[in-house]
Amino acid sequence: MLITIFTPTYNRAELLPRLHKSLQEQTNKNFEWIVVDDGSTDNTKEVIENIILQQENDFPIRYFYKENGGKHTAINRGVREANGDLFFIVDSDDILTFNSVELISIFYNQIRDKKSFCGVSGMRGDFESNKIGTKVTFDILDCTIAESGYKYHIHGDKAEIIRTSIMKEFPFPEYNDENFCPEALVWNRISKRYKIRYFNKIIYLCKYLEGGLSYQQAKLLEKNKKATMLTYKEIVESVEKPILFRIRSAINFWRYTLLYSFFLGKKYRLKWYWIILLPLGLFARCLKG
């Protein structure tokens, strides 16, 4: 099987049929759909059971329920259950273009035997099919996920499809007292060893929330300090990245975690000389709230 299309969901029962419809419309059905329910209290289970029993599906659908732990823990569960060569995270409130799997197959076959690649990535668009993020002119681009931002200045979410074996190699850390982990932590780790092939085709449609998402993300980063510290610490220590990029990450480290890292072990601490940026982190915290 080529792809595991994976959907983590939490109280989004009413949106799952729309996503399912976009999967039914795929021109290439070489995929399975795994839904991991992260502790929903609505009728998600009944909706999925109805889809499995009453709809005509020419692709496998599997549903798993777990206690609420956050999207990253649902991803870890999905990776463990996946049968596809590739792992594609598709959120419950989003859909795929009709030729998404077909395009993934075409571009993945170009790099399938190249072990230096972790996978491929298409573009995201809004529901009017306008591209989200930086407008790019390339047809294909080979670089790491991290390089796409700091080297090629490509910003905005993309639609990454990663080899399942590599997702298993780089699971999200899980903490009992936290329910969020930035995906950047895993992408940065993957970037240290693998490239990805970007192709300039929209394969993923979602609602673009300008402003609101960044505010919510900031609150999550502040609340889930261990995962946040680990993410920014590893970026700061990535010597291959430009120094200004690392400085900005160090400022964000202090902005979201204050002095909390001093109460934990070395795993979460920056080297002593980065404390010079603590005042800028506090200033950013006061400025942005």
What function would you assign to each model-found segment?
Residues 66-82:
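Glycine-rich, basic loop-to-helix element that forms the pyrophosphate-binding segment
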Residues 12-25:
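Short, well-formed alpha-helical segments that are part of the catalytic scaffolds
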Residues 31-39, 62-66, 92:
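Short beta-strand/loop segment that forms part of the nucleotide-sugar
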